[in-house]
Amino acid sequence: YKYELQSSKKIKYKISRYRWYSFLKMQKKVAPNIKRIITPSISSKKGIVNEFKCNKNNITVINNGLDTNEFAPIENFSRNKHRIITTASADVPLKGLDYSLKALKMLKKDFPKIHLIVIGNIKKNGHTERLIKKLSLEEDVTFKSNLTKHQIKELYASSSVAIVSSLYEGFGYPVIEAMSCEIPLIATNVSAIPELTSNYARLIEPKNEEMIFNSVKEIFLDYPKHIEVARKGREHVIKNFNWIKITEEYEKIISKTIEEFNNANF
């Protein structure tokens, strides 16, 4: 909630977020009394402890899982040499799309044919559309929505670099989806993201189009090196975020909770 408020200076947006998160008052009362909480990242665990005043010993971290067969590289699928891909809901400042767009403008000088694919919607006459016009990027950005998982996989397979420029992520599915599809990844070094990427992505500071620009350029100019990192990144995702591992962790904690409940004195 507080990260969304910090991400935008617009009063109207802040009011809408305040109304949306009004249920948090109830959660703050209930959460400290819950004996077992499961959350998908260490970062979100810290947030629950700090914001909801919960006992850290009552909180278990179990990552979200991913079907790594659905999100996988496609053999003999040609990559567009200078295509970038990102996932962002337009006009949601927390996703940091502005900084990717500003970096794209800078990159056009060195890579005139560069193109950005955004998986998400664009709001008619909204902030993002206005920024694209201001930067003269109308022909260089394409928004795609209502896609199947296979279509998303094809977009990753046909792109050369993925960017996650979020200002906050409680988990961050676009991170592990991109890594599972074996595409070089640039991601912000915030909240849960570095937990997911380990050493298999180029981490940058948030709100920094200069770092996005430099990172994309570096990957373009030494692609074989970074595609090898991406291959190791997929192995990392398969090992740590496969559904068999995740369901076993859930089974273990649920069984433990049931056992503690049966042994409790009421």
Can you annotate each of these PLM segments?
Residues 184-187:
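Short hydrophobic beta-strand element within catalytic cores of glycosyltransferases
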Residues 202-209, 218-223:
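Conserved acidic donor-binding segment of nucleotide-sugar-dependent glycosyltransferases
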Residues 43, 65:
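Carbohydrate-associated surface elements
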Residues 146, 154-159:
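Short alpha-helical donor nucleotide-sugar binding micro-motif in glycosyltransferases
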Residues 167:
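Aromatic "clamp/platform" in nucleotide-sugar-dependent glycosyltransferases that forms part
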Residues 128-150:
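Nucleotide-activated donor-binding/catalytic signature segment of Leloir-type glycosyltransferases, i.e.
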Residues 77-95, 101-104:
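Conserved donor-binding/catalytic core segment of Leloir-type glycosyltransferases
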Residues 1-28:
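Acceptor-binding helix/loop patch of EC 2.4 sugar-transfer enzymes
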